[in-house]
């Protein structure tokens, strides 16, 4: 199977982005990773992202500071005055853990690195259960890809398209876990907890989803 040339993967340190990183290693010749320190409550995830990038032997791992998020209020992930919810995500509205425009900002920054590195794929691990978040939906990914192509120096010079690689859009978290098992992802070295505690709290929405997805695997 022919491999694509290069990709930069958004790597949080969680099971979804780790699986995407291992999938990228299989599908691409050159793999870069990028992580973000945006004042998140669960900043400990960056420690896991660094270890995963090292294990995956990526070309380079960039950790980017996004300090302005600490000025925003209302999200449980960046505002310590907002309590992290327990239990499942709400079904029909964005949860209190939504960080405004996070994936738009992250994809924009990653696209600048992709432009500079001259790789034309940007990987993001959004999946079917992420749909309560507006910036995880298929229509957002399509729009983001269009905007990146409209503004890319790489595209203008090379006459090649940029692609937002989001292979998990139609997959459940369990599907991702099973794929990760097949790829040999070290799930024990991933981290998913909105509280940012070690060990994880086991009660927040992402802890619950992780436990259900990895049942019988980890």
From Swiss-Prot:
Source superkingdom: Bacteria
GO molecular function, one term: zinc ion binding
Positions bound to Zn(2+): 193, 201, 204, 207
EC number: 6.3.4.20
Catalytic activity entry: 7-carboxy-7-deazaguanine + NH4(+) + ATP = 7-cyano-7-deazaguanine + ADP + phosphate + H2O + H(+)
Biological processes per GO annotation: queuosine biosynthetic process
Pfam families registered for this protein in UniProt: QueC
Cofactor: Zn(2+)
Pathway info: Purine metabolism; 7-cyano-7-deazaguanine biosynthesis
Family according to the record: Belongs to the QueC family.
Protein name as catalogued: 7-cyano-7-deazaguanine synthase
Originating species: Aquifex aeolicus (strain VF5)
Species lineage: Bacteria, Pseudomonadati, Aquificota, Aquificia, Aquificales
Gene: queC
């Amino acid at each position: 199977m022919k491999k694509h040339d290069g990709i930069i993967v958004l790597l949080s340190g969680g099971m979804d982005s780790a699986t995407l990183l291992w999938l990228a290693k299989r599908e691409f010749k050159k793999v870069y990773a990028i992580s973000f320190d945006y004042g998140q409550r669960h900043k400990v995830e960056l420690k896991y992202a660094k270890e995963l990038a090292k294990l995956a032997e990526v070309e380079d791992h960039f950790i980017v500071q996004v300090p302005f998020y600490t000025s925003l209020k209302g999200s449980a992930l960046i505002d310590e005055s907002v309590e992290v919810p327990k239990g499942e995500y709400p079904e029909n509205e964005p949860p209190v853990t939504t960080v405004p425009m996070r994936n738009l900002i992250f994809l924009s920054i990653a696209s600048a690195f992709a432009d500079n590195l001259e790789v034309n794929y940007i990987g993001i691990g959004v999946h079917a259960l992420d749909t309560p978040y507006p910036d995880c939906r298929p229509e957002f990914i399509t729009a983001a890809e269009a905007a990146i192509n409209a503004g890319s120096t790489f595209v203008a010079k090379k006459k090649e398209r940029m692609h937002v690689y989001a292979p998990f859009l139609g997959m459940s978290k369990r599907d991702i876990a099973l794929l990760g098992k097949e790829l040999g992802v070290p799930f024990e070295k991933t981290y998913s907890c909105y509280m940012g505690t070690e060990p994880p709290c086991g009660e927040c929405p992402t802890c619950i989803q992780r436990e259900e997805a990895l049942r019988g695997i980890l």
